[in-house]
């Protein structure tokens, strides 16, 4: 776990080295997104780490909002790295906001690992709006 004040770029050389070495493990970058620690200045608002982490082929990146998402991601990472023996490492953004953690909806595990799942349906209205979000902004989206 590291304080990602300036984001993934701060540890970029180490991340590339981990990729080249085929390292396995988890990097948890604290203070994710552009919404946390806004009062401390823009340098504390990491909004670009996923652009940088996406350039490393064996770096798997996630921006979870809820604790159950983090549990699903870590469980899948352990399976991939240690059972399947894949040479991947994970970058996971975590945040420092305190809020109510919901129970995990049934059947979201596969969608979360793939990158998207339906958190709640919109009902049976004819016109629908599809909202997407992750990480620090998801609570405002819902």
What kind of feature is each model-predicted range?
Residues 1-2, 60-63, 131:
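Short catalytic-loop micro-motif centered on adjacent basic/acidic residues
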